[in-house]
Swiss-Prot record:
Keyword Transmembrane: yes
Keywords: Membrane, Transmembrane, Transmembrane helix
Record gene name: ykzV
Disulfide bonds: none
Residue stretches spanning the membrane: 29-49
Natural source organism: Bacillus subtilis (strain 168)
Membrane disposition: Single-pass membrane protein
Family: Belongs to the SscA family.
Annotated Gene Ontology cellular component terms: membrane
Protein name: Uncharacterized membrane protein YkzV
Subcellular location: Membrane
Length: 52
């Protein structure tokens, strides 16, 4: 489920505007990026005691 794009069937897997075939990660890559950004935001808010 992670590295389909570089082999066959990359286009059929699809992606969120990452081009499926071009990057080869598709939804999994987008999901990891979103989770990573959320983790950074939550971590910064927790360690910094809030945004304000």
């Amino acid at each position: 489920m992670y590295g389909y794009g570089y082999g066959g069937g990359c286009c059929s897997y699809g992606g969120y505007g990452y081009g499926g075939c071009g990057y080869g990660y598709g939804r999994t890559f987008a999901l990891i990026v979103v989770l990573f950004i959320l983790l950074i935001i939550v971590g910064a808010a927790y360690l910094g005691g809030g945004c304000c």
